[in-house]
Amino acid sequence: MLENIRDAVRKFLTGSTPYEKAVDEFIKELQKSLISSDVNVKLVFSLTAKIKERLNKEKPPSVLERKEWFISIVYDELSKLFGGDKEPNVNPTRLPFIIMLVGVQGSGKTTTAGKLAYFYKRRGYKVGLVAADVYRPAAYDQLLQLGNQIGVPVYGEPNNQNAIEIAKKGVDTFVKNKMDIIIVDTAGRHGYGEETKLLEEMKEIYEALKPDDVILVIDASIGQKAYDLASRFHQASPIGSIIITKMDGTAKGGGALSAVAATGATIKFIGTGEKIDELEIFNAKRYVSRILGMGDIESILEKVKGLEEYEKIQKKMEDVMEGKGKLTLRDVYAQIMALRKMGPLSKVLQHIPGLGVMLPTPSEDQLKLGEEKIRRWLAALNSMTYKELENPSIIDKSRMRRIAEGSGLEVEDVRELLEWYNNMNKLLKMVKRRRGSIDKLFGGKIG
C-alpha cells in the first residue's frame, strides 16, 4: 500500500539506523509498497535503479542533510513515474467547447460527466450535458439526476437508440442555447478486453461530432491493466486525455496512474471520492507529496526550491560577468529569499557577500548581526517601487528618505544596501569569466 511509504519516510528521517543501511531498507519498502499497489514490476525496479544511480553519481548540496537529499531524489523520481512536470490544460481553448467522454462499463463515466460539469460550472462556464449512452437503461436517469443536483441542463432521448443522432442533436441544441461547454456522455457497453470495439465506436462518434477534447475514463481498480487501454486510446486519439476514477476506493491507484503515465497520455483529472466536487486536476508532484507525507517532506522541498531559485540567480551573475546585462535589486531580493528557504542561517549566511559572516562557523553574535542585516535589507527592498528595483541608479536622497520611512529604517540602512549593491556590480565586472569566480565570490558552492 502506498501509505506505507509515508511511514517509511518518517522512519528514515527520524531513525538512528546507519545511513547506508537505512537507504537499503527504505528502497526495499518502496519496492514492496509500489508492487503491492500494482505498479508494474519493471517500472518499480527501473525507478529504484535510477535512485541508486543518482546516489552514486551526484553529491548532496550543502544545504541538505544526506537523508534529506535522498528523500528529495525519491520525490523527484517518483514524480517522473507518475507523469513528471506535465501540467494538464483544463481550460477550454475556444467556446463552445465540446468534450466527449468514453469508457468501458463500470468505469464511472456518467458520474464523471456530472463531476466535470460541476467543475466547469464553478469556474463560471455555462455547461450542458448530453446523455448519449443508449445501452445502459439507467444512464439517462442518472445523468438527469446529476444535472438537476448541480443545476446543469441535460439533453437526452430515452426512447431513441441511435447514440450518434442523440449526440449530434444534443450538441446542436446547446450550441443554439449558447452554452460554453458541452459534455457528451457516450455509450459504455464494452467491458475490459473489448478495447477494439470501444475505440471503433469512439471513432464513429468522433467523426460525427468533431469534439475539441476526447476523454477516456478509467477505473483505478484495474491497476497496471490500464496500460493497454490507455496506450491504444492515446494512439487512436492524440488530442485525448484521461480521467482516472475511484482513486479513493482501491489499493491499485498507483498502478493505474503509473501505467497511464508510461504511455505518454495526459492524465487530466482524478476522481477522489463519490461526492460531486471530488474531482481534482491531476498533478504528479502533488500526488507524490501526499504519498511521501507532505508534513515530513515540506521543509526538504522548500530547501530544494530555494536551491533552484538560487541557481537561477547564480546563472544571472555569470551572464553579468560576461558582460550580458546587469544585476538588479530585484535579483538581490530573489537571491535573499531563495537563501532563506534553504535552512538555518548558520548554513546559508556564508554564501551572501558583504555581510561580514564569511566564516565556516560564525559566532552567535555574527549570526544575529547577519540576520538583522537581512531583515533590514528585505524591509528596504519591499518599500521600493518596481522602477527602483529594476534601476537603482534613480534612487536619490529623497527616494532614500521615502524608502526608509516606508520600511521603518534609517536612511543610513538604505544607503548601506545601495553601496553593497554598487560594490557587488563592480566586483562582478572585475571577476569577469575566471572559472570558479562565483564560488569565490560567494564563499563556497551551495550545490
UniProtKB/Swiss-Prot annotation:
<feature type="binding site">
    <location>
        <begin position="103"/>
        <end position="110"/>
    </location>
    <ligand>
        <name>GTP</name>
    </ligand>
</feature>
<dbReference type="GO" id="GO:0016887">
    <property type="term" value="F:ATP hydrolysis activity"/>
</dbReference>
<keyword id="KW-0547">Nucleotide-binding</keyword>
<keyword id="KW-0378">Hydrolase</keyword>
<dbReference type="GO" id="GO:0006614">
    <property type="term" value="P:SRP-dependent cotranslational protein targeting to membrane"/>
</dbReference>
<keyword id="KW-0694">RNA-binding</keyword>
<keyword id="KW-0687">Ribonucleoprotein</keyword>
<dbReference type="GO" id="GO:0005525">
    <property type="term" value="F:GTP binding"/>
</dbReference>
<dbReference type="Pfam" id="PF02881">
    <property type="entry name" value="SRP54_N"/>
</dbReference>
<comment type="similarity">
    <text>Belongs to the GTP-binding SRP family. SRP54 subfamily.</text>
</comment>
<dbReference type="InterPro" id="IPR000897">
    <property type="entry name" value="SRP54_GTPase_dom"/>
</dbReference>
<dbReference type="InterPro" id="IPR042101">
    <property type="entry name" value="SRP54_N_sf"/>
</dbReference>
<dbReference type="InterPro" id="IPR013822">
    <property type="entry name" value="Signal_recog_particl_SRP54_hlx"/>
</dbReference>
<dbReference type="InterPro" id="IPR022941">
    <property type="entry name" value="SRP54"/>
</dbReference>
<dbReference type="Pfam" id="PF00448">
    <property type="entry name" value="SRP54"/>
</dbReference>
<feature type="binding site">
    <location>
        <begin position="185"/>
        <end position="189"/>
    </location>
    <ligand>
        <name>GTP</name>
    </ligand>
</feature>
<dbReference type="GO" id="GO:0048500">
    <property type="term" value="C:signal recognition particle"/>
</dbReference>
<dbReference type="InterPro" id="IPR004125">
    <property type="entry name" value="Signal_recog_particle_SRP54_M"/>
</dbReference>
<comment type="subunit">
    <text>Part of the signal recognition particle protein translocation system, which is composed of SRP and FtsY. Archaeal SRP consists of a 7S RNA molecule of 300 nucleotides and two protein subunits: SRP54 and SRP19.</text>
</comment>
<dbReference type="InterPro" id="IPR003593">
    <property type="entry name" value="AAA+_ATPase"/>
</dbReference>
<keyword id="KW-0963">Cytoplasm</keyword>
<protein>
    <recommendedName>
        <fullName>Signal recognition particle 54 kDa protein</fullName>
        <ecNumber>3.6.5.4</ecNumber>
    </recommendedName>
</protein>
<feature type="binding site">
    <location>
        <begin position="245"/>
        <end position="248"/>
    </location>
    <ligand>
        <name>GTP</name>
    </ligand>
</feature>
<comment type="function">
    <text>Involved in targeting and insertion of nascent membrane proteins into the cytoplasmic membrane. Binds to the hydrophobic signal sequence of the ribosome-nascent chain (RNC) as it emerges from the ribosomes. The SRP-RNC complex is then targeted to the cytoplasmic membrane where it interacts with the SRP receptor FtsY.</text>
</comment>
<dbReference type="InterPro" id="IPR036225">
    <property type="entry name" value="SRP/SRP_N"/>
</dbReference>
<keyword id="KW-0342">GTP-binding</keyword>
<dbReference type="GO" id="GO:0003924">
    <property type="term" value="F:GTPase activity"/>
</dbReference>
<dbReference type="Pfam" id="PF02978">
    <property type="entry name" value="SRP_SPB"/>
</dbReference>
<keyword id="KW-0733">Signal recognition particle</keyword>
<dbReference type="GO" id="GO:0008312">
    <property type="term" value="F:7S RNA binding"/>
</dbReference>
<dbReference type="InterPro" id="IPR036891">
    <property type="entry name" value="Signal_recog_part_SRP54_M_sf"/>
</dbReference>
<dbReference type="InterPro" id="IPR027417">
    <property type="entry name" value="P-loop_NTPase"/>
</dbReference>
